[in-house]
Every structure is written in structure tokens, then in C-alpha cells.
Amino acid sequence: MCQGIYYLINNQEVRSEFSNPRACLPVRIKGGALAQLPWGRRRQQAGNLPLGGWARLDAIYSGHWDRWRPLPVKLEIRQFMERDIEERHCWFDVTPGKWIQGLIAHWQQERRVYVVTITPEMDDALYERWPRILSDSVVPRT
């Protein structure tokens, strides 16, 4: 479910977990610059956007997020941390050339970014959810 992230911004390393109420995610904005936006919303945080830090892809497709004017974005994350079904933490590298999909949600002046997640297709998957990892280029089949 992507509980932690590692990225570089302005040549500074950032490692954070969702449990930190000040956690931000690196969003690639128009023009190529990186911006840091608040990662989701926690119970103790004021606001009207959804609680949590993740947006299920099937919920996006079903229109659940429409009321928050969702905007798909690229998250420039180098590593992410998942907690498996036995509560063990494991860090995973994001392959160069790939990126994690995010969603910016809006409510009046409030903006937060959520990690888009998918459900693993394998019956014996160790993780309940996985970040949606995409690529700018499509490799032709040979």
C-alpha cells in the first residue's frame, strides 16, 4: 500500500512515511519542475478531502473520486516501502524510466496528493495493494 517513500528534490534526499503528518509527495508539474504536496489526510488533520493516502484505481474508474476533481500526476519516487500481510517492511526500487501514478484531489483551496493503487492479481500475493507503476514509453512486442 506504499507506506513509505524515498526521493530526491533539489539534490536533497527525502525519506518519509505516511504516518508522519507532514509527509509530502514529489509531484512532477507542467514545465518539468518538482513540487511537494501533502500526502493524503490523517484523522487529526483538518480538511474535507478523503482520509488516507491512497486512491484505489477501481474507485477512480467508478467515479468515487469525481467530486474532488481528480488530476492524475507523476510521482517522482525512487523507492517505496510496503508492509506485507505479516506486517514486515520491505523497500522496493522504482525502475529508472518508470514512475508511480498519483492523484491530486481538490476541495475549495485544499489540495492533497494520493498514491494510486491496484490490487495484485496473484492469489498468493504478499501485499493487499500495490502502487500503480507506469512508463512514458511503450516497448513494442517482438
Regions found by a protein language model. Give the residues of each.
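Short linear sequence motif anchored by a di-proline
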Residues: 1-142
